[in-house]
From Swiss-Prot:
InterPro entries: NAP-like_sf, NAP_family
Gene Ontology cellular-component annotations: chromatin; nucleus
Organism: Dictyostelium discoideum (Social amoeba)
PANTHER family: TESTIS-SPECIFIC Y-ENCODED PROTEIN (PTHR11875)
Protein name: Protein set homolog
Protein family per UniProt: Belongs to the nucleosome assembly protein (NAP) family.
GO biological process, one term: nucleosome assembly
A GO term, aspect molecular function: chromatin binding
Biased composition range(s): Polar residues: 141-152
Ranges of biased composition (kind: Basic and acidic residues): 156-173
Length: 237
């Protein structure tokens, strides 16, 4: 075979599935597989560099975000309205969202943090909840699971007692109702107790970047992907 002659690879595939053709080719040709791996590696490095640029831009703009924060606080129930709209679109009517008093996002080289402040309420004792989401620092970490942590949530006594009564009453029902225990805590409170990457990144990427649109309910299209993702997550449980 001459140096310039193309290697022939025997492939069986469905004509109406072009993606299968490429997958089959990469599986059977080690040179193509090596090339694919190299491209994937470069793509990861590119994504990491873009993320670093985004962080640098945010750091430069943070003083402006803080200035904006003070102005937004002058609008009555601004963040409470935004979080209520968000979880309504996810299918939850949640009293706790109306108790959000302030909100801010900080971004560092290794993580971003959501600071959610609360006014006095009958559900949780926390005055502030901080949700921390780690961000990759190497291209290898891009494919790893994101670590998310949250402030321990202190449920008020009446909330705890109500949940306990609900659980006790459900113990006497059929086994098929056992899954309902997971639904006792839902919506915003569930997110605070067990935050998800999809909702956290959506809040930062869409809500935080354009809060006026969210306040005026002019961001319906932004929610489409989040609603689909949240629905898939519920089905997988």
């Amino acid at each position: 075979m001459s140096k310039h002659q193309k290697k022939e690879v025997e492939v069986e595939f469905e004509k109406d599935d072009p993606k299968a053709v490429y997958l089959e080719l990469f599986d059977k040709d080690t040179e193509l597989k090596s090339l694919s791996d190299e491209i994937e590696k470069l793509t990861g490095e590119k994504d990491l560099e873009l993320m670093k640029c985004d962080k640098d831009i945010y750091k430069s703009a943070e003083p402006l975000y803080r200035e904006r924060r003070a102005l937004l606080l002058e609008i009555p129930d601004f963040w409470a309205t935004i979080f209520t709209n968000l979880f309504l679109k996810l299918g939850f009517v949640d009293e706790l969202t109306m108790c959000v008093d302030d909100f801010f996002v900080e971004d560092t080289e290794t993580e971003f943090r959501l600071f959610i402040d609360f006014r006095e309420n009958d559900i949780i004792s926390n005055k502030q909840v901080i949700i921390t989401v780690t961000t990759p620092t190497t291209s290898e970490e891009l494919s790893q699971e994101v670590k998310i942590s949250t402030t321990p949530i202190e449920l008020k006594q009446n909330k705890t007692e109500t949940e306990k009564k609900n659980k006790d009453s459900k113990k006497s029902t059929d086994d098929e109702d056992e899954d309902e225990d997971d639904d006792e805590i839902s919506g915003f409170l569930k997110f605070l107790l067990n935050p998800t990457k999809d909702i956290a990144t959506f809040i930062v990427g869409s809500v935080w970047s354009n809060p006026i649109d969210s306040f005026c309910n002019d961001d319906d299209e932004d929610y489409d992907g989040l609603i689909a993702s949240d629905s898939e997550g519920e089905e997988d449980k």
